[in-house]
Regions:
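Soluble or luminal CAZymes and related metallo-dependent hydrolases
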Residues: 24, 28, 53, 98-100, ...
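A contiguous active-site-proximal alpha/beta segment in oxidoreductase catalytic domains
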Residues: 1-60
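NAD(P)-dinucleotide binding in Rossmann-like oxidoreductases
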Residues: 112-205, 223, 250-254
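Loop/helix-junction capping segments adjacent to catalytic residues or to phosphate/diphosphate-binding pockets
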Residues: 26-27, 55, 125-126, 221, ...
């Protein structure tokens, strides 16, 4: 935390700094965030995220909840279980091997909103450990790639997040991701189409585009203050895991 305070001092002295964070720019995450911000769920009160680790997870969780720098009470635990080892950065497995894996589960109580963080490191590469997202509001919710919401007190609409990719079923536009729609509305359009890129590569590329815009006088897209806050929440979550007791965050210098 002291190192982040020192780094933020550069901003206080006039430095212009953004941080290269891409997870909230992943196509489906960006589509979910846009849908939440569109208001159809009403006031969002809870988000459950099992997608990515540490500060990456915090960055997505905060956006789904509409949280800025509010303080939280955090309780967290870990749970170790066996799992058949899957692929990794060096490639697929060559034989069956059972290894131990650690699950992190944390409850972040922001008072009027609740964040639930749940992650196992194997989720990045495992053949069977998937991702899960739930966002709950007073008028509806998102569960993974489906939204359900009220248009009035007795009428519910259920609609999927539809992924649009070029190049399948006879389509000759090329092989690339186009975006996501919910109903008739585009929630996300790929800014790097028609590049043939993975979702993570699209997110990193979008981050670079936004960094260039910022350097040219454009708006923040992931400020040092946000990055410090997400890492701070991650640090306090680890503290709660290790101590086994609730931890309370306090307002930091980068929160203004």
């Amino acid at each position: 935390v002291e190192e982040m305070e020192g780094l933020y001092g550069l901003v206080q002295n006039g430095a212009k700094i953004q941080v290269a964070e891409q997870y909230h720019l992943h196509p489906l995450h960006a589509a979910r965030i846009a849908f939440v911000q569109g208001g159809k769920l009403g006031r969002v009160t809870q988000a459950q995220l099992s997608v990515c680790h540490g500060y990456h997870g915090m960055s997505v969780l905060r956006r789904l909840l509409g949280i800025g720098f509010e303080d939280a009470t955090i309780c967290a635990r870990t749970f170790v279980t066996p799992i058949v080892k899957g692929p990794g950065r060096s490639g697929p497995p060559v034989e069956e091997e059972v290894v131990e894996t650690k699950q992190e589960i944390a409850w972040l109580d922001f008072g009027d909103r609740l964040g639930v963080f749940d992650f196992v490191g194997d989720q990045y590469f495992s053949y069977f450990r998937g991702q899960r997202v739930c966002v709950r509001g007073e008028r509806g919710e998102i569960i993974d790639d489906r939204a359900r919401y009220l248009t009035d007190f007795k009428t519910v609409v259920e609609t999927p997040f539809i992924r649009h990719d070029a190049g399948a079923l006879g389509n000759l536009e090329g092989n690339h991701h186009k975006g996501y729609t919910v109903g008739e509305d585009w929630m996300y359009r790929n800014p790097l189409a028609p590049g043939e890129l993975t979702d993570d590569e699209i997110a990193v590329g979008d981050c670079l585009l936004k960094m260039a815009e910022y350097a040219d006088g454009g708006p923040d897209f992931y400020s040092l203050a946000e990055a410090c806050q997400d890492r701070y929440l991650d640090i306090k979550m680890k503290e709660a895991e290790e101590s086994g007791v609730e931890v309370r965050t306090t307002r930091q210098v980068w929160a203004g």
